[in-house]
Amino acid sequence: RICTNCCAGRKGCNYYSADGTFICEGESDPNNPKACPRYCDTRIAYSKCPRSEGN
């Protein structure tokens, strides 16, 4: 289980609950991070990042 929230999540990454329900897309650009609260959205279990560079 990852610890993040929609605001702090990486832009271009989709966040899902444990049963595969889409929750949100991340809003924070790695090159220009948003000022986000550091809390864990307990609904978020994993992410998929189809548009991220690298992996």
UniProtKB/Swiss-Prot annotation:
Disulfide bonds: C3-C40, C6-C24, C7-C36, C13-C49
Domain of life: Eukaryota
Signal peptide: none
Gene Ontology molecular functions: serine-type endopeptidase inhibitor activity
Site feature: Reactive bond for trypsin: R38, Y39
Keywords: Disulfide bond, Protease inhibitor, Secreted, Serine protease inhibitor
GO cellular component entries: extracellular region
Keyword presence, Ribosomal protein: no
Pfam families linked: Prot_inhib_II (PF02428)
Main location: secreted
Location within or outside the cell: Secreted
InterPro entries per the UniProt record, alphabetical: Prot_inh_I20 (IPR003465), Protease_inhibitor_I20 (IPR051391)
Its job: Potent inhibitor of trypsin and a weaker inhibitor of chymotrypsin and pronase E.
Family: Belongs to the protease inhibitor I20 (potato type II proteinase inhibitor) family.
PANTHER family from the UniProt entry: PROTEINASE INHIBITOR TYPE-2 P303.51, SERINE-TYPE ENDOPEPTIDASE INHIBITOR
Protein name: Proteinase inhibitor PSI-1.1
